[in-house]
Amino acid sequence: MQHARQHRGRRVRRVGTPLSSIQHIKQGPSEEAKRQHIKRLRMKKQRAQHAQRSHRPRTNSPRTSGKSPKNSLRIQKPIRDRWAAIAEETQRIVLGDGQYVEERIVPAVSSAVAQSYTQGSSFVDPLISSLKALQMQPAHIAHNIFSQIQLSRQGTIFFPHYSDSLANWATAQKRALPTLSQTNIKFVHDSTLLAARQLAQSMSSNTSRIGVLSFASPKKPGGGFLHGGDEQEETIARLSSLVASLTSPAAQDFYKEHKKHWSEDGSGLHDHSMLYSPGVVVFRADGDDEEINLGDPVGGAFISPYQIDVVSAVPVNAAAVRAKHIILPSERQFFEDGIRGAMKERMARILRVFEEKGDKVLVLGAFGCGSSQNDVEVIASLWAELLSF
């Protein structure tokens, strides 16, 4: 993005994230008074909205309807403390020896069933006896994912903001891929990792790998996952080996580039750099995975490991862009078009990375529609446009 600033009586242009749609607009004295008035009204409205949001329970936290705000916060704190404890244990496993024990509940049949087949004094229906004698018992299964974690960490690839292979996504010669009979697009109201696990269960070992988009923090690996955060990337980091990749040497370049662009631009558009983490191991269940968690909304139960390929990219922080600029009603569409243009470029590069790496089964999601406040209809339309490109 290019924008102009007043500096010692002259106009200076600073180059940041390339987006021409959002620029400062030259203002006259009468316009300035109008802008300041609108800004005061908007700030008052934002403060009211922020106060309302601070007392609103999170959608993927346990339901707290009918509770007072204070009671809701008291309910959520233990949940977040448990998420933080799970995240710390996950990090110890991932950055340690990679070993954990899965507890799986399996059916067990008592010896009475076997005896019924050998007793000849009276007839015993084997099916009825089996159902009566059926019990459930825990089975403990040890897993060692150390080697796969190291492969994922070593295979992590950094794609810089000025990546020629990604910047030319619209005109690049596409690699020859096997012709598919059809492309299936499915909309589900599930978490990212629940959708990924269901795909992993339905796919045979010789089919395509699963690509997952992670809505990355521009500042630190996994965002606030160690503090009980439950944003999308934080959840993935809490339940998988992603943190090993995000702390790799390649990832350090990713965070350095974001810091550099933020210091140059600072508008919330962020840059187009991204990470590709192959073979990330998922070994814990998400909170909405009722098959595993049996109604516990916290999640985190150990499961049999499966692998996903993760692209970590930072969405445009639309909320920050709107807050940074004084936007008149007549200018609103101008700014929204700029945000849309930046998101389209970033999302196209994400798909290009998956295409280059051969990931044909993707879990994408509402990229940047949480705290970044991108419009969900805009993001859906962009995915539709790019997937049919």
Model features per residue range: what roles?
Residues 2-362, 366-389:
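Macrodomain-like recognition of ADP-ribose-binding/processing modules
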